[in-house]
């Protein structure tokens, strides 16, 4: 019984830790000016093996589950609400590309706090590593899947000269 209480207490504190840390990271991430995401940083580059996002769908079937991921705007009003995308024009697509970069960065950073559990009991460490991965990696994959497709759409719109709706 004493051991069970200890596990429940540990689970509660771990849950509170993740809630506070991830909400703060997301909040700070939304404050990064868009101009930083307009730069061409290597982390956001689509690599050859990704084949413009096709890799992610071939190996992880992204199209089948990406719509089931909770929209971050529901938890944090500062996060871009994709439902406001009423028209497809270059300005909106550029904003969506910026937001895929922002979301990817936020979720990479959100994995890092797992380091605090490094010295903890093995079970606690493994559970928290699992949580950090399962809560963040799917969102990173979706961003890496969507961004090349949005970039291609942006190229097409710019070629056609469709600047505004």
Swiss-Prot record:
Pathway entry: Carotenoid biosynthesis; staphyloxanthin biosynthesis; staphyloxanthin from farnesyl diphosphate: step 5/5
Membrane-traversing stretches: 126-145
Membrane disposition: Single-pass membrane protein
Domain of life: Bacteria
Protein's UniProt keywords contain rRNA-binding: no
Any single Gene Ontology cellular-component annotation: plasma membrane
GO biological process: carotenoid biosynthetic process
Single GO MF annotation: acyltransferase activity
Keywords: Acyltransferase, Carotenoid biosynthesis, Cell membrane, Membrane, Signal, Transferase, Transmembrane, Transmembrane helix
Coiled coil is among the record's keywords: no
EC number: 2.3.1.-
Subcellular localization: Cell membrane
Signal sequence segment: 1-28
Family: Belongs to the acyltransferase CrtO family.
Protein function: Catalyzes the acylation of glycosyl-4,4'-diaponeurosporenoate, i.e. the esterification of glucose at the C6'' position with the carboxyl group of the C(15) fatty acid 12-methyltetradecanoic acid, to yield staphyloxanthin. This is the last step in the biosynthesis of this orange pigment, present in most staphylococci strains.
Protein name: Glycosyl-4,4'-diaponeurosporenoate acyltransferase
Organism lineage string: Bacteria, Bacillati, Bacillota, Bacilli, Bacillales
